[in-house]
Swiss-Prot record:
CDD domains: YlxS_C. The keyword Cell inner membrane does not apply. The gene is rimP. Keywords: Cytoplasm, Ribosome biogenesis. This is Ribosome maturation factor RimP. The lineage of its organism: Bacteria, Pseudomonadati, Pseudomonadota, Gammaproteobacteria, Alteromonadales. HAMAP family: RimP. Required for maturation of 30S ribosomal subunits. It comes from Shewanella sp. (strain MR-4). GO terms for biological process: ribosomal small subunit assembly; translation.
Amino acid sequence: MATLESRLVDMLTVPVEALGFQLWGIEYVQAGKHSILRVFIDGENGINIEDCANVSRQVSAVLDVEDPISTEYTLEVSSPGVDRPLFTAEQYAAYVGEDVKLQLTMPVAGSRNLKGAITQVDGQMLSLNVNGKELVVALDNIRKGNIIAKF
């Protein structure tokens, strides 16, 4: 059975792309009785507040018709930002050489939280240099991954 996030990606990719943007990813966070659905979009020329508002209206209309979430939730549409979350193998591969912060489902090398540089992405496996040590992490073991912004 597909996860809610993967069903939402399938449902929302075409409407977001029809507006000229890329659906970067989706996070669904349950917070008690009220949940948050975060939709991250990206574009060739970046994203502004008007872009987010337009996508929000379109996504909201699709969600009202499809009704994939049975509980009350807040819809948030935004750019991924400088510390952008990473969702797919392609996104991780695009950031080889960059530092990332990972939260894992199962520990790797005794830790569920890793920080290091992406050295390689091979299929569904991510290689990470953590303090000079090469670690391999299955992408399906990553609960959350973000770029570490450099200022």
